[in-house]
Amino acid sequence: TVPIRVELARSIRELSKGYMGRDNIPEGTGMLFILKKDEKLSFWMKDTPTPLSIAFISSSGEIRETRDMTPFSHESVESSEPVRYALEVPQGWFKKNNIGAGSTIELP
């Protein structure tokens, strides 16, 4: 088990803002995006100066895939299938903690 402290993003404003404009995201923290239903998700890094990694997570808490994202990129990073959650963390956190597709998270 690897603990992580997360901010929750649920409202439309929180979901669309994410980590935009934040210069520092402490190690061991992340942002969990919570959707009302399973859907294909798309994220970009506009106005986000910190390199991030993202996990796309099923409604049962299984990580389906992880991807790295480039600061300030306008390119979309999309889930390959409908998911319920996404977790953004400092880039490399998943790899460092040996977490990837098939891993499960305990959801709030």
Model-derived features: positions:
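Compact, glycine-rich, soluble single-domain proteins
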Residues: 1-108
